[in-house]
UniProtKB/Swiss-Prot annotation:
The lineage of its organism: Bacteria, Pseudomonadati, Pseudomonadota, Gammaproteobacteria, Pasteurellales. Transmembrane segments: none annotated. InterPro entries: HI1480. It comes from Haemophilus influenzae (strain ATCC 51907 / DSM 11121 / KW20 / Rd). Gene3D superfamilies: 1.20.272.30. It holds the Pfam family HI1480. This is Uncharacterized protein HI_1480.
Length: 156
């Protein structure tokens, strides 16, 4: 399965996509928690392709209960196992600190499309379940081709 296929699969399952919505709301606590999870320096870094695969596993494993879920990351970190765990954590921390990884929280509810195509890349859009929005999203990254997807969130 390609990275594009993985992304589109997640888009069709929004419950798995909005898990990390309020990342920067609890930014310093998250970084501290992640840093405590790192046991040792990785022997090597992950390729961009492998980084994306591991990030998707991580994001899918997070609970979708708002910012508090970021303060309890242990279960989600278990999704990244084996030799890549240490490297993934180091790269995740580095990307967060440098703002290379951007997780956006949208605060607009409505039926009009939100055009996010002018945002800097790479980025992931992860929304909380209480939002209802139709979003057109352009994702660009070195490991991903341009992908335009539309998806809807409706709060039950």
């Amino acid at each position: 399965m390609s990275e594009t296929d993985l992304l589109l699969k997640m888009v069709r399952q929004p419950v798995k996509l909005y898990s990390v919505a309020t990342l920067f709301h609890e930014f310093s606590e998250v970084i501290t928690k992640l840093e405590h999870s790192v046991q040792k320096e990785p022997t090597s870094l992950l390729s961009e392709e492998n980084w994306h695969k591991q990030f998707l596993k991580f994001a899918q494993a997070l609970p979708a209960h708002g910012s508090a879920s970021w303060l309890n990351l242990d279960d989600a970190l278990q999704a990244v196992v084996g030799n890549s765990r240490s490297a993934f954590l180091h790269q995740l921390i580095a990307k967060l600190k440098s703002r290379h990884l951007q997780v956006l929280e949208l605060n607009k509810i409505g039926s009009e499309p939100l055009d996010l195509s002018n945002l800097p890349a790479p980025f992931y859009v992860l929304l909380p379940e209480s939002f209802a929005a139709r979003i057109t999203l352009l994702v660009q990254d070195k490991a991903l081709p341009y992908v335009r997807v539309s998806f809807e969130y409706w709060h039950a």
